[in-house]
């Protein structure tokens, strides 16, 4: 459900996007042409398995194109950003590809949602991408929930990848009871700050 409001919070328009099954909404951002691009999960059928779903709309919420990515298992998108080199970088998680369980799933597309490359990251347990931001050197920093590595239960992970999706480094933070990360921001001089609970 995409809703546009004015500065007073009054609704200008709204549009419902999806199938007759349980689709999932992730992130939505405004694009340079005044439209919007959304990422989430499109239900494959009634069994609740989804594919990563990207929807591009114009400034009034009318769909201009859609793309879906993934395999026969459940895959979903959680975040998206506009790449400075053109196109979009999509973050999510996949059960169709990777090392088993749920893995981090990154897809790079052109301006029309055509895939240029995709990569997975993670171990044999569940690792789920939560948010992605641009790094100062042109790569990307990913915040994720990790069970494959770290101190046990659900720890927070930070993953640095290049602009081509190659892993540069990864870190995990957390204790035996788990520490979910809630926000990741670039501050200055190549440094980052993360809020956890």
Please tell me what each predicted stretch does.
Residues 1-197:
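A sequence-level/structural motif corresponding to short, flexible coil/turn segments enriched
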């Amino acid at each position: 459900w995409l809703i546009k409001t004015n500065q007073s919070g009054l609704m200008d328009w709204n549009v419902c996007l999806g199938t007759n099954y349980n689709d999932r909404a992730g992130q939505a951002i405004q694009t340079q042409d005044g439209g919007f691009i959304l990422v989430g999960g499109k239900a494959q059928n009634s069994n609740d398995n989804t594919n990563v779903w990207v929807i591009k709309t114009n400034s009034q919420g009318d769909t201009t194109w859609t793309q879906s990515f993934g395999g026969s298992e459940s895959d979903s998108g959680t975040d998206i950003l506009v790449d400075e080199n053109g196109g979009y970088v999509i973050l999510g998680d996949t059960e169709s590809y990777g090392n088993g369980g749920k893995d981090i799933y990154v897809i790079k597309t052109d301006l029309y949602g055509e895939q240029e490359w995709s990569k997975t990251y993670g171990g044999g347990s569940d690792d789920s991408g939560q948010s992605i931001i641009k790094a100062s050197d042109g790569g990307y920093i990913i915040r994720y929930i990790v069970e494959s590595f770290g101190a046990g239960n659900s720890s927070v992970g930070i993953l640095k990848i290049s602009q081509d999706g190659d892993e540069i480094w990864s870190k995990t933070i957390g204790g035996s009871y788990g520490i979910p990360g809630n926000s990741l921001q670039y501050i200055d001089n190549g440094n980052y700050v993360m809020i956890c609970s």
